[in-house]
Design a protein with these regions (language model features):
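Exported/extracytosolic protein signature
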Residues: 2-3, 21-166
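Sec-dependent signal peptide hydrophobic core
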Residues: 5-12
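N-terminal signal peptide c-region/cleavage motif recognized by signal peptidases
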Residues: 12, 17-19
Length: 166
C-alpha cells in the first residue's frame, strides 16, 4: 500500500476513534475505505490497495447500536483526509454538513467571506479541497439498529516544492 493511501487511512481511523469515544455510548463504528472503479459505466467498489493521484476512494462508516436502549442525538462524522479532495454530491445520505477544521460544521456548499483589494468583502465558495470532515445528524438509533454514511474523495497529486534559483 503506498504512502498516500496509508496516511489517508491512518488519519481517517484516528478521527473515527475520537468520534466514538466522545459519544460514550454503546454505539460502535467501523470505517472502510474502498477504491471506486468504473466498470461498464457504473461505479464498482474494490479493495483500496495501492492508491495514486486521481484515484477515487469511498469512505463508508457503519454505526451499530449494541445497547439495550435507543441512542439519541447520534452524530456520524467521517474525516476527509489530508491529501484528498471531497467529491461534490458524493455524500450519502445527501444532507451532510461539512467542515474545514473538523469542529465547526455548516450545510454544503460551504462559503466564506473574502476581503477584496478595495476593502469590500464578498462571499465565495470554499474549495472542496479545503473540506476536512463531513457530519450527519442521525438522531435516534434504535437498540440493535445499524446505519451507514459514506463520502468519496479523490487522491490529490503530491505537492512538488522546488527551491528558487538566485
Amino acid at each position: 500500500m503506498n504512502a498516500i493511501l496509508k496516511v489517508c487511512l491512518f488519519a481517517a481511523g484516528l478521527a473515527m476513534g475520537q468520534v466514538v469515544l466522545a459519544q460514550a455510548s454503546p454505539v460502535s463504528s467501523q470505517l472502510v475505505a474502498q477504491r471506486v472503479e468504473m466498470v461498464a459505466g457504473k461505479p464498482v467498489l474494490k479493495a483500496a490497495g495501492d492508491g495514486k493521484p486521481g484515484d477515487v476512494l469511498q469512505y463508508s462508516a457503519t454505526y451499530r447500536n449494541t445497547g439495550a436502549a435507543a441512542a439519541a442525538k447520534l452524530l456520524a462524522t467521517v474525516p476527509v483526509p489530508p491529501g484528498t479532495t471531497f467529491i461534490a454530491a458524493s455524500a450519502e445520505p445527501a444532507q451532510a454538513q461539512a467542515s474545514t477544521d473538523g469542529a465547526t460544521f455548516a450545510p454544503m456548499p460551504l462559503t466564506r467571506m473574502v476581503k477584496l483589494a478595495d476593502g469590500s468583502t464578498r462571499k465565495e465558495p470554499v474549495p472542496l479541497s479545503d473540506y476536512r470532515a463531513l457530519r450527519w445528524e442521525i438522531g435516534t438509533l434504535a437498540a440493535g439498529a445499524t446505519t451507514a454514511v459514506s463520502l468519496r474523495v479523490s487522491i490529490d497529486a503530491p505537492v512538488v516544492v522546488s527551491a528558487a534559483k538566485p
